[in-house]
Amino acid sequence: MERIIVKGAPGSPYTRKMLSLLRYRRLPYNFLVGGLFDEGIMDTSHLPKAKVNLMPTIYFKNKLDNLEPMVDSTFIIRRLENLFKERSVVPKSPILKFLDYLLEDFADEWLTKATFHYRWNYEKDILKAGSTLSRWRSLTYDEEKIKPIRDNISERQISRLHVVGSNKN
């Protein structure tokens, strides 16, 4: 069985979700730590770019045997279900399948609001999250080198709080 290529970040809830699913289903994969701020860290130039740069990006071979990026975890799960029958995560019962989809959609859309809010709304949390996220690929960087990376990540995430529905209330 060919290994599935997963590009993501360790702290991304969706990346964690997909890695957990792949491990549960015992599907072999290669995990590439990547994202918006990985210039010069890991060469992913051979991989096609997704239309929307989200994490994780999973690469599937298409009918022409070319890699094709996919970013929505719900649709990735469905595609994996079609490709691999062992250790399915989608119930066979139509009622349970509907409830499974409903719960997954709820978690995808609503739990991320809390994740974003508590990572990026309060000063101490912003510093902690920015420092942690910026060091995944730069463990040996000193403060002078890490600060612009941390600031860039923090500014981007804070600017997106409204997208996930987080606000001061």
Language-model segments: which ranges?
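A conserved mid-domain beta-alpha-beta active-site/ligand-binding segment of alpha/beta enzyme cores
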Residues: 144-169
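GST-like domain detector, emphasizing the conserved glutathione-binding G-site
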Residues: 1-144
